Amino acid sequence: MFCAFCFLPGELITNRAVSLYTAVKATRIFCRKINLPALLFPTLTMNLKGNILISTTDFGGVYLLQDVVSVSLPVNERMMIKKNHFEPYNLTGNEKRICIVTGIHGDELEGQYVCYELIRKLSENRHLLSGIVDIYPSMNPLGMDSIKREMPIFDLDMNMIFPGSETGAVAEHIAAAIMNDIKGADICIDIHASNIFLREIPQVRISEETAPKLLPYAKMLNVDFIWVHSSVTVMEATLSHSLNKEGTPTLVAEMGVGMRITKSYGDQLLDGIFNLMAEMGIWTGETKKVSHPIVSTDGNVSFIYSDTSGIFMPAIKHWAGISKGDHIGDILDPLSGAVEQEIFAPCSGIVFTLREYPVVYEGSLLARILGGC
């Protein structure tokens, strides 16, 4: 690969005072001065500062792989949280910025496919980018590597320590660095999967307090369902709550099941993200028509719990319409061959949450029905 940086003055490369953007811009100007054909430098990559890499194309886009935070670990190792930063070549200073965040829980993988596809499409169509996109694929890399929901060394739920503290313990320091990096964005989407026990349809969850501001954005995301929670049930130490409190609009998107990737759900949310980016003036490419989600509050949701232990065998499909009295499933006893409990719908509606993991105990959540009783 031809590298245009080879022809740049040495001080441009070594002087850390020179901004990354200036370095990229200087490279482009130099290449144009010598009439270098665009095909000879489709990608220019160089380590200019620490772990930051720059890549550009002649289509007018720039992306940067950046460290958000880096902390020391035992045995001479480091944990690094990275982001992929996309911006248009000709910056005006008025660009809108969107942040896509996922992987706060190490066992939630649905967002990995979304990040991959989003980065792939942006890389191939940077000339259609008119705003700034920051993508954070793994906020809890240790949890993802060890297949654990929490941060394994600290045994902490990472989504329960925000906004963190720059001078606090390691986990708090990490949380504060993430907050500082995202803060100020025009919109942030925090992508989650369910846990390993439940399967969820693509949905956005927001609080009653933030609904007036966030609901218009949520309706653009091509989800099936928007759940407006009571403010009493909102956990204040989450990333989304902390960012919203700081003035950065943040949506929580949830879909699928833990430790799995549902491609159809990922594609659905991707269409919504590009639609939202287009509506905000960040993306100028074509977008697909999005669905109109059902909007509901806590009062419209019914919870179905198990009364006994055993193996749950559903008799309905996920996201299926049911009527009051319909057979939802059975709880079986494999040892005796008996049906311990037959479960019937207490009301009519749509099943938007369904038990995925078969083993249940008394009080286990089996389903949630949109409809209310």
Where do the language-model regions lie?
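Polybasic, lysine-rich low-complexity intrinsically disordered segments
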Residues: 29, 33-34
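Short non-domain terminal segments
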Residues: 3-5, 28, 39, 57
